[in-house]
Regions:
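An N-terminal-biased, well-structured beta-alpha scaffold segment characteristic
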Residues: 2-109
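Phosphate-coordination loops involved in phosphoryl transfer and adenosine-cofactor binding
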Residues: 3, 87, 179-182, 254
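Phosphate/diphosphate ligand-binding glycine-rich loop within oxidoreductases
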Residues: 71-153
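Adenosine-phosphate binding glycine-rich loop
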Residues: 116, 121-171, 262-360
């Protein structure tokens, strides 16, 4: 039987330092008979030499286009714009199955080349629950940035750091009045919500946690009565949003949105008051200037779509620990394990919908 070949590509996004598989987990794949190739990367938080020492084959940056046809190409964020046709099996977060911006172009590239997109977001168990995610650290960083902004201690541009440095900033925020804030975490019991809660506790911020029951019957005034909203809700079907433009003119305490989910361009956006991401260089954008006579404060948003990369080492280690056992499932005798089959079905459905809509 031909060994499964996993090819860990470099990331094309300049601020992306995470890795889907860390050096410490490479031997687990090699011991299972896998072939592991790692591209050189000047920005990855783990040195290429660490992968070589773990037994991986090292190749040049961006050479995945010449990888063997049967290789699984692993990454984190979007592919570069070239080539126009994709013929490998790619594993990464594509954000292309819910009508997001550029989704059609991404799917077209796979359709032209005959490749397949196994989106990590759609690796799910038999109950439909995601089995791999960066959610905890996304929530942690998103909530942390919200607190720092509210206490006037957020400094741009942002850059990656170890967790102890971020925690020191949160502790300082706690001494700068964070305990007087009120924070609301939607999706508070999920991975991202738990991470957000942990960061807020570190800063000493009182936290309200809403989950499905509380958000199903939304209490809009209660939501507006918090200083910080950390949105950690992911939905695959359009539903009633938490905050709409008309809400911003009402009397409110709310001053900062930290949109961890960051599904800003699709129909499942739970915060349609914002339709653009923010960046490491400009992490905060003003959404509403406020109106003192109506009791409305200025409202700002933080909507960074790769939050965990601000803590790249911790985020990668946790993610790799979750993903590596499922990579082993690619070599099961009866074919790839259930989560990979689920991701494959999601891709097939997205392509069928593209063809049904008249995509070229």
């Amino acid at each position: 039987m031909q060994p499964v070949h996993v090819w860990i590509r470099s990331e094309s996004r300049g601020t992306e330092r995470r890795a889907p598989v860390v050096p410490a987990d490479v031997p687990l794949l090699l011991d299972a008979g896998f072939e592991v190739t790692v591209e050189e990367s000047p920005q990855r938080v783990f040195a290429t030499d660490e992968y070589a020492a773990a037994g991986a084959t090292v190749v040049g940056e961006g050479t995945w286009t010449d990888a063997p046809h049967d290789a699984y190409v692993l990454g984190i964020k979007e592919l570069p714009d070239e080539p126009e046709s994709l013929h490998h099996r790619h594993v990464y977060f594509a954000h292309a199955f819910k009508g997001q911006h550029d989704a059609q172009d991404t799917l077209e590239r796979f359709r032209r080349g005959g490749g397949r997109l196994l989106d990590i977001e759609y690796l799910t168990d038999t109950d439909g629950r995601r089995v791999v995610a960066f959610g905890y650290w996304a929530g942690y960083v998103g909530a942390a940035l919200g607190v720092l902004q509210l206490t006037g201690t957020l400094v741009a541009p942002l850059g990656p750091m170890p967790k102890h440095e971020l925690d020191a900033q949160l502790a300082q925020a706690g001494r700068s009045g964070a305990d007087l804030l009120l924070a609301l975490v939607t999706g508070g019991r999920g991975r991202s919500g738990r991470g957000a809660h942990a960061a807020l506790v570190t800063a000493g911020v009182p936290v309200t946690r809403w989950d499905l029951r509380e958000t199903r019957d939304l209490h809009k005034q209660a939501l507006l009565g918090h200083d910080l909203l950390v949105n950690c809700v992911v939905t695959r079907t359009p539903t009633t949003p938490f905050l709409e433009p008309a809400d911003l003119d009402h009397e409110r305490r709310l001053r900062v949105l930290a949109d961890v989910t960051c599904d800003v361009t699709g129909p499942t956006n739970m915060l349609p008051v914002n339709t653009e991401i923010t960046t490491w260089d400009d992490p905060v954008r003003l959404l509403h200037s406020g109106s003192p006579e109506h009791g409305t404060a200025p409202l700002e948003v933080i909507a960074i779509d790769n939050l965990p990369s601000l803590l790249p080492r911790e985020a990668s280690e946790g993610f790799s620990a979750d993903l590596t056992p499922h990579l082993l499932g690619l070599a099961e005798p009866g074919g790839p394990s259930a989560p990979w089959q689920a991701a494959g079905r999601a891709f097939d459905q997205a392509v069928d919908e593209l063809e049904g809509s008249g995509g070229s």
